[in-house]
Amino acid sequence: MEGIHHGGHGGARPSQSMAFPGFDADSHMMSDDFTFDSPFSSSGSSNANDGVLGNSIFPEWTNGAPRGESPDEMQRKDPLAAQIWKLYTRTKSQLPNQERMENLTWRMMAMNLKRKEREQQEREQQARASETVSPAPSGIEMRISDQVSSAGPDLSHDMNLDGTSDAMNLDDFIIPFDSPAEHPSHPSADRQFTATPTGSIPIKSRKDAMMEQSTAASFPRAPQDQRTNSEFGYVARRVRKTSVDERQFFAGLSVPTRKRPAEASPQVPPVSNAIVAALGIVSGLPDYSLDHPPSAFALPGNGTVGPRRPQHHHTHSNIPYGLDTYGLNEDHGINSAGPYQQNFHFSPSESPMTAGNPFSRLYTQTPLASSLNSTEFFSPPPSGYQSTVSTPQPIYEGEQSIFFSDAPSAESHSQRRIPNYIQQRQSNLSASLQPRYMYNMNGDSHQGNAVTGPPTTHVSGFSVPQPQHVNPAQVLGHGEFSTTAPATSMFTFGGDSDNEDDDGNFERGRMTMPNDFASMDESGDMSAGLHWDGGFPGSVQSLPGFSAQHRKHVTIGSTDMMDGPPEWNQGGTLGRGHGSVASVSDVRNQNQDPRRYGKVPRTASTPNAAALLRQSLNGSASGPPTNHPSPSTPPESGLSSAVPSRPGSPGGSKNGDPNAGPTTCTNCFTQTTPLWRRNPEGQPLCNACGLFLKLHGVVRPLSLKTDVIKKRNRSSANTLAVGTSRSSKKSSRKNSIQHAPSTSISSRINTSESPPSMTGSNTLGKPGVVPIAAAPPKSGPPAGVAQGRAGVQVAPRRQRRLEKAPIGSDQDPDDSPKSAAPTSRSKVVPLAPAMAPPAAANPANHSIAGGQGASQEWEWLTMSL
């Protein structure tokens, strides 16, 4: 009975009384029955083993294993298991608790098997350790090891058990890949060892090689060798658990993985040139970098004069006209961030997130400054696209543009067709991202709106062909274009300032725009730019020498209209040094008309700025103004037919449009907020939703909506002059230059008791709010009445959205003496310009969206300063 209490290798086992408490009274029967020469230990009991335990839970009973399950061999290996098995096979039909007995038997056998597996693994580890220490086992050592293995439990039997395939091991069925840990080593037969004279294996120092070959994580890996020619080629390669299981490439299996394979990552060379010089793998990479290259779309004149030449950086192509013959659109390995990367091509008046691929060869070369600045350059829509901070965007500086020819040809006289300027936009983008252009739109009220080039000998300007009339008298000529002006940084992301109402020094994220778009030829004809026809009333040129300017000039979504002049860089457009606050010295130093400035408006949700200007343009150029129900849906949006993903918010109330409603938050649809903000798409958000989105990064839930607006306890919160002083003070705190003229006589004032409602009802009456655009002027009282009512009206703060106020007219600059308007650089703006429309009061806000009087007032403002 000693084997029951102390079985195996000296390990304590549960006694018989513990395992079977009901058999204490029959110990003499157990001693008789469990003797190993019992007549019940016949071959019949071992034959019963095959039917009961013939499954794959225990490897001993699988097919292919040597059958040694006689009771004698079981007794030799594990006495307790043998005796319990004999008991069970004999009395399983008479036991009252046979299910419990069977369960207990299985559990005890499983414990024994686990213990044997642990012991076997320990022996294998010791054997491997002895192999690494000794170079080759001699004959004596091999005999000793054989004696040790035979003296202990049957090691060869255990090896054979492990060598068979286990039906419960799923790894054998997924990818048959060998590793040294799965199979025991056979030191005597399987491997050939070459003994060295010194008795040790010469292991080379691989530390230098590892330091030499360490590259960046984004660097493309060479095809992994099968390690057949290396020194340790017999060692199976360790599988590194990365994003892709590399075993499938070795096994030749196409096992789909859930993660993105590493081959779809951008193949960007590392930044350090020392690493690149030591590796021959760089020669297989395409010629691009993540730096800011002078691309083929870069500017010829950073103060230099000369024709534009395509930049041949690395690839010197012999193909004429610089045609793209590689078909990079079909190369899915180059699309660095999946299929969405090809939509980042920048177009003249559209955001980089256009659907389709209209100008891929022309606008691919626009440099996205870096990974961080490109985040400020384009903001992805609220969907699951990738981050530009973590995803590098490759730039093909060596590829040439296929759109324009490099040499003048006979076909260049004819207008080239732009195939499908923009495709249907993706439906997950919201309404503000619809493409809207001043050119290539339905000509309901805009006749002759084809974009044409001047009648030169070789016209590089392109046209969007429309079946409409082209007025040759209104085609812009040579003198309209500047070729020597320096390049200006034109676009900054609107989210880079904390408060949207501050004009600040936005020197951080920028993007450089070219001198002109079209003249790619070598002949020096720099005047054939991207020409807008000045004939149709939606054009900026219908206003004589004037175009609107806005505060931050960001194109995040698509733009409402092209407020820019025909040249994109007329005199530098506006120096970004003062955050789009043009100083008068900048204006005076320009040789061109000082009133011809303009930039792309902010977004489609800059409702009042673009729409009021368009209304005044339509009214001044074509007679009756065309009233639109909302500035967010202008008439130029004829190209866009995508359904918005959520109801579009009505734009800001226009003073001349009776149908326009107040600005509504696109998230909570409120109309009362102390400060209007914008989401990354440019749609208006209330202060609460905007702050919530900026702080938390998610949209503010509607359950948090409340109509109670908490105010700060300011003593003079309702006075207009203090509000304007606060806004100018904040602007001056950001080192921007503000010129606040004290206009006493010729200031435009309101004929109502409340200031005009601006974009999102932003007026100077609100503290810290610089309006975006002014309202179109209407006929008002004469100068005497304006002077008499200049400093009287102080509207209450709550009253500004309740009524739409017409605006007093401009006074002609001939009627207003210059001495009556002294200049003031004070931080506190006086009260009279606070009641005036903000374009006259605050030149930091150059959105003078007026008619003829607006350009005259700008001229007067320039002269007075």
From Swiss-Prot:
Keywords: Activator, DNA-binding, Metal-binding, Nitrate assimilation, Nucleus, Transcription, Transcription regulation, Zinc, Zinc-finger. Residues 32-46, 771-786, 830-844 have a biased composition (Low complexity). Residues 582-592, 715-724, 737-764 have a biased composition (Polar residues). Pfam families: AreA_N (PF07573), GATA (PF00320), GATA_AreA (PF08550). PROSITE patterns: GATA_ZN_FINGER_1 (PS00344), GATA_ZN_FINGER_2 (PS50114). GO terms for molecular function: DNA-binding transcription factor activity, RNA polymerase II-specific; RNA polymerase II cis-regulatory region sequence-specific DNA binding; zinc ion binding. GO terms for biological process: negative regulation of transcription by RNA polymerase II; nitrate assimilation; positive regulation of transcription by RNA polymerase II. GO terms for cellular component: nucleus. Residues 1-75, 115-140, 177-227, 557-605, 617-663, 713-854 are annotated as: Disordered. The keyword DNA-binding applies. A zinc finger (GATA-type) spans 665-689. Residues 115-126, 180-189 have a biased composition (Basic and acidic residues). The keyword Phosphoprotein does not apply. InterPro entries: AreA_GATA, AreA_N, Transcription_factor_GATA, Znf_GATA, Znf_NHR/GATA. Major nitrogen regulatory protein. This is Nitrogen regulatory protein nrfA. It comes from Penicillium urticae.
